[in-house]
Amino acid sequence: MKLHELKPAEGSRKTRNRVGRGIGSGNGKTAGKGHKGQNARSGGGVRPGFEGGQMPLFQRLPKRGFTNINRKEFAVVNLDKLNSFAEGTEVTPELLLETGVISKLKSGVKILGDGKLEKKLTVKANKFSASAKQAIEAAGGTAEVI
């Protein structure tokens, strides 16, 4: 067998249905659109969410909540990610960004307590969860809020 003889497995690829190409094709003349009406016209059809004049679902349901314009979004780092650093390292947001642990600084860095920290580190971040702070100090390191 040569490269030009390769063919996809039987039934793995369906041929495109070419509509409006003669009566014999089974999809000629009206091209599967039926006779006249809004959906038979070019650009025909209704917009998404339109229910024929009935009050649409999204308008029948109440509004909920709001978007806080002052919200802060933190880059999240779990404890198990900090094990990649050498013992005694001072872990800063800049170092985390440099090493690819986080992709963006956002509004700062928050350290969360998922996983187990096995090294003594000095961690500097904008926020710490209670469990993360406890785990860092239990490993002999320090958690410093910047």
From Swiss-Prot:
**Signal peptide residues on this chain, from the entry's feature table:** none
Its keywords, alphabetically, are: Ribonucleoprotein, Ribosomal protein, RNA-binding, rRNA-binding
Q: Which residues form a coiled coil?
A: none
Task: Tell me one GO molecular function of this protein.
Answer: structural constituent of ribosome
Annotated region (Disordered) at: 1-54
Short name of any one Pfam family annotated for the protein: Ribosomal_L27A
One cellular component (GO) term of this entry? cytosolic large ribosomal subunit
Composition bias, Gly residues: 21-31, 42-52
- Kindly give the NCBIfam families that the UniProt entry links to this protein: rplO_bact
| Homology family | Belongs to the universal ribosomal protein uL15 family.
Q: What interactions and quaternary structure are annotated?
A: Part of the 50S ribosomal subunit.
Q: What does this protein do?
A: Binds to the 23S rRNA.
Protein name in the entry: Large ribosomal subunit protein uL15
Q: Which organism is it from?
A: Bacillus licheniformis (strain ATCC 14580 / DSM 13 / JCM 2505 / CCUG 7422 / NBRC 12200 / NCIMB 9375 / NCTC 10341 / NRRL NRS-1264 / Gibson 46)
Q: What gene is this protein a product of?
A: rplO
